[in-house]
A protein has these predicted regions:
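Structural preference for solvent-exposed beta-strand-turn elements
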Residues: 1-433
Length: 433
């Protein structure tokens, strides 16, 4: 194992925690900045591996991107300013980069190939290939398995009205980004509203985009073709998916009080906070503000006695990445927690139904995997264990937090995988002990 990390139990976590910038917003700020006229300045950018993959791809297409300790400056070249890359575009481990870029690249007048690591190249890309092909894109899976590597040739795009079978922000975003270049208007309807960062940011960059929640609960985003986007200043809020680990740590660990600073609380992402409240958590939002359409706040968390809850339906897309952490909270809570409608977990960095179940069972929890989620009987004391992260950053972090309240030490294998989204995670965790 590359990097085993031993986590000892503790109590009394205290302090103020700065959360790294939101991953979704960081990716999109680079992409839109590159396609805009003028410069885009980005502060609190997430310098994790995934977002650096996005930067690398645009640099390969002739976009100058300056990195200083304070900010990132993207020198945009306008909607038609990208140039053909000399080599394969390396998307690393980043599904966001791959799926969103597929929409942008489909509209370019050059051929490109995107490829990533073994995990990325096994994740499903048919969900973007299908709608983009309907728009006139020439996009093929090199190995014929509907996965990356993806080869994209120039195509004349036309607008479509697409109904997505999944509430996936990445699918929606790929179509909307392609729609900027299409002949005619484009709409995407999804079964429930997924993350809407793309819509909010496109609007702030000057695109003509509208969003509606339909009477039946489905959500439609509608974009018109765009002449130009214009560079913006963006202060990226803290990533609630990263904040979730410290919120959970404050709730689960005895005698704790943490202030988690500058967290994005966009309603399409804040399902985790709703679940915490439903479980009886002592959570207070302070210093709420709004910038670039994205709300943010500091979150004050105190140790709480939690109880079980049911998580399903439209709530799922607002907390999909937090489910491993929620499962840990459920194991420490009194009563039963049921998670369903979350089959999407199977196609994340790992099959998170399986990896969460394995890790929780190894610590002595009572968890039953289901086809679209899991059932957790809480209230059993957990003990330290050897946890295989399977190189999944969310598993590594969720079980590092689980370890704090367990009986005995826990070893997390391959803990360096947290670098994908939260390189300072273990340092900050040690700092609040």
């Amino acid at each position: 194992y590359m990097s085993d990390r031993i986590i000892c139990p503790c109590k009394g976590l205290h302090g103020e925690i700065m959360i790294p910038g939101d991953k979704s917003i960081s990716h999109r700020s680079i992409m839109l900045g590159a396609l805009a006229l003028g410069t885009t300045e980005i502060t609190n950018f997430l310098e994790g591996a995934d977002c650096l993959s996005t930067i690398g791809c645009f640099q390969s297409m002739g976009i100058q991107i300056d990195r200083t300790p304070e900010k990132i400056i993207v020198h945009g070249k306008g909607m038609h300013g990208l140039s053909a890359p000399k080599d394969i575009l390396n998307v690393g481990n980043s599904g966001t980069t791959t799926r969103l870029m597929s929409g942008i690249l489909s509209a370019q007048d050059f051929t490109s190939v995107m490829s990533g690591d073994a995990s990325l190249n096994s994740r499903p890309m048919g969900r973007v290939i299908t709608p983009l092909t309907q728009m006139g894109a020439h996009i093929t899976s090199v190995n014929g398995d509907l996965c990356a590597p993806l080869k994209i040739k120039p195509g004349m795009l036309h607008g479509i009205d697409y109904t997505s079978p999944v509430a996936s922000a990445q699918v929606k975003s790929a179509i909307l980004l392609a729609g900027l270049y299409a002949d005619g208007e484009t709409s995407v309807t999804e079964p429930a509203l997924s993350r809407n960062h793309t819509e909010l940011m496109l609007k702030s960059f000057g695109a003509d985009i509208t969003s509606t929640i339909n009477p039946d609960g489905t959500a439609t985003a509608h974009v018109k073709p765009c002449q130009e986007l214009y560079g913006q200043s963006i202060c990226v809020p803290g990533d609630i998916s990263s904040a979730a680990y410290f919120i959970a740590a404050g709730l689960l660990t005895l005698d704790s009080e943490l202030l988690v600073k500058n967290v994005g609380i966009n309603k399409t992402r804040a399902g985790f906070l709703e679940v915490c409240r439903n479980m009886g958590a002592d959570i207070t939002l302070v210093n709420e503000s709004l910038e670039g359409g994205e709300p943010r706040a500091d979150i004050l968390v105190r140790t709480s006695k939690l109880h079980g809850t049911t998580i399903e339906g439209a709530l799922i897309p607002t907390l999909i990445d937090e489910i491993p952490m929620i499962a840990v909270m459920a194991a420490y809570a009194e009563g039963t927690t049921i998670i369903k409608d979350a089959a999407e977990l199977k196609v994340k960095e790992t099959n998170r139904i399986d990896t969460t179940t394995e890790a929780l069972r190894s610590m002595g929890a009572d968890i039953t995997p289901t086809d679209d989620g899991m059932i957790i009987q809480g209230g059993h004391a957990l003990h330290g264990a050897k946890i295989n992260s399977y190189l999944d950053h969310r598993i590594a972090m969720a079980f590092a937090i689980a370890a704090l309240s367990a009986d005995g030490d826990t070893i997390i294998h391959d803990s360096q995988c947290v670098d994908v989204s939260y390189p300072e995670f273990f340092e900050i965790l040690d700092g609040c002990r």
